[in-house]
Amino acid sequence: MADRYYLYGIFPAPGPADLPLDGLDAQTVQAQHLGDFTFLYSVACQKRYLSSRKNLLGHEKVLEAAMEQGHRTLLPLQFGLIVDSWEQVQDDLVDPHSEDLAQLFKRLDGCREVSIKVQWEPSTELEMMMAEDATLRAQRDQLEGTQLGMEQVIFIGQQIEAAMEARKQGIADQFRQALTPLAKDVLENAPQTDVMIYNAAFLIPWESEAEFSQAVDAVDASFSDRLRIRYNNFTAPYNFAQLN
């Protein structure tokens, strides 16, 4: 049976070659040149790959290894992409999208993606908000000490909920104001959990990461220990490598 190929990412030619690295199923990572582009791949040993943590990390490891070797301009491909032949890739991707691919590479050249995820502790923030806002505190106390009608209960609950949402957005805005001016592009993603209040990716010049990291730390420090921040400064540019 003919080999099938698992694809990791696309690079401007000549791209990486002879990476001393194994990909999924411990298969050797190889390079295939198609016109102005180079594809990193390995032989696919499965009909389809489950999106397990091991497989996802294996996919990402290949791209990070190429980046570490200096091949920083790349288009990561979605996990699980398997093709039957290079003719299929040429016909379905390279030929119809070569100009779009070239424009994406031009946009990404000299840039890196960094991401930030910010979490808070809702109960702590609620207590802080109540301590700061006498009106809301009085409304909450009404809920605890007075027999109220359903409409009043709903109204007070909505007031507290709206105030918490405004507080959440106020924190997110401080990150936006500090970080957006340092980026060439920004993409905000939906929060992944109930306690996540900000989730964004930034496309920044490669050499400006230290400045960006310092800006993240400065905003974090302004909130003392109230927030939990996950900052990733080394990843393939998944958020900014989308074909139109």
Q: Which residues does each PLM region occupy?
A:
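An interfacial alpha-helical scaffold signature
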Residues: 1-230, 234-244
